[in-house]
Amino acid sequence: VTERSTDTAIVGAGILGLAHAYIAAKSGKKVTVFERHPAASGASIANFGLLWPIGQTAGRMFDLAMKSRYQWLEILQAARIPYKDTGSLHVACRKEEAAVGQEFAELGPTLGYQCAWLSRDETLARSPAVQPAAVVGALWSGTEIMVDPREVLRKIPEFLAEQYGVQFHWNCPVHSVERSRIVTSRRTWQAERVIVCNGTDFETLFPDFFAQSGLVRCRLQMMRTGPQPQNWNLGPAIAGGLTFRFYPSFRICRSLDALRAYIAQQMPEYDRFGIHTMVSQASSGGLTFGDSHEYGLAPTPFNRDCIDAMILRHLETFLQVPDRSIAERWYGVYAKHPEEPWVRYQPEDGVDVITGLGGAGMTLSFGVALETLEALC
């Protein structure tokens, strides 16, 4: 079989692979994407669809998230993919949660965050989804965006193929990458640059590296309702006070220790399963609820009903929506490194292996792609 060539070959059509394809194609490169499944089916479609800059630490990571946000808006508008540029609310229902939100609202603007503390009445005016009897106040941020990951992962490839001539090879596993050659079951390709965005597949390509990389898999459980009646609109994306302990940006708050201590003492099962609560709304009108976090190399395929019940139970303390009936339940798995925001491995010149963005894949992918392709130029 004859060998073919391309400028930039990308292995994996999840959001990280698509982000690299977009940045490379925009710069005039001939781009070819290889995906072993009929469509992307990993972590990229099994998440909230939240672009969440406020969760990233001040400085390089927040700046990268904002660069990524700019690229997201560019491609969403160009591809005519629906999105909700609504910002977010971290809803506080206890004094410990409010203390963190208020402290971050004081510190955040000096570090570049577009955020403010809202009183109870201001929170209720901003969101129809918050129970008046429950809320103390909320941390407002204007930078968060909601997309439907299923829609995005379907429409971006169509747009890239049509607008930039990006070639997609679906059902096409890559068996090896060596000396800028990509060997598939169909043929061998030669590329100037190869970017491997393998997600949680640590076994197929470069298994020796992954075995000593420190990467783990994180398993999360999520749910989605059907479309809400009468086009009910969530407004800003919602996070509960438990979320303050999850994102690294909030570690600058001294008051976080008291909240962590309260949760450890009063809600230890939420720590055991790494549960915090968030709500996003897809373009279909359905609400996505989650999520939990369990770490290891071999995540179980079996959902725990108690985890879903705990997520819903906590949401019930502050969330009011017209129809909370669950239409879908699933689990997702993403790759994460315990210390690094992501892992980049360069087995040889012109080959980059990138994974391990953890829960920030949607938020950071386009920014990471910019860094990769600047570094490779």
Residue ranges and their predicted role:
Residues 188-255:
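Central helical "cap/lid" subdomain
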Residues 9-11, 174, 182, 189-201, ...:
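Short hydrophobic core segments
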Residues 63-64, 91-100, 139-158, 301-307, ...:
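Short beta-strand to alpha-helix junction loop
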